Amino acid sequence: LIEVTGKQFAWAVRYAGIDKTLGKRDFTLVNGDNELGVNWNDAASHDDFMADEIVLPVNTPVSVNIGALDVIHDFYIPEFRMMMDAVPGVPTHLWFRPTITTDSMRLITKNPAFDYVLACNKLCGSGHYNMQKKIRIVSMDEYLKWQSEQKSYYATVVKPAIEAGTFKLPSTENSPLHESTLTNTESSENSGAKIETKLSTGFELVGANKDGVEN
């Protein structure tokens, strides 16, 4: 399970940790040190990690929660013929199955520099072109090795700041804690919008959120 959040002009990528559950977010906690408003009081957030690139295992269903912080963006992977709006305050969701690794696609295209790329397909401002994030589709062994090397944001940034007395966990008793997006594919399947489409472009789209599908 991963969460991809659009902002001017970049993508923030958050992975669920070994518990396979993303920590909750609360818009009242958004500030310069916590742009996603992650609720660090939620133990589920303690093993989540942020990533500079999107790494996915081949032939494995991937659940993606999609959102935005400012204006409307669009989660768009052109090689997959797949896109979904990223709307502030309106969570969207996709799950799909990558079927061709990056290395295999480089051989197929005869382009050793080929990379899958997440782009924004909405004109979101002057820095729109900068909204590109590299995607690597790898074997499961490669993915597990990469995953084991990632460090949780809570353990490396938040906890040391708390221990140093430079950061204090806020009280959230009176604030509306919420899950930033759907947390599993069950909600998607129960919405009646599940579809199955097999393309020859390196992925298999197997589901979308209740608001519809763009592909």
Task: Please give the residue ranges for each predicted region.
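Non-transmembrane, membrane-proximal soluble domains of secreted or membrane proteins
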Residues: L1-N215
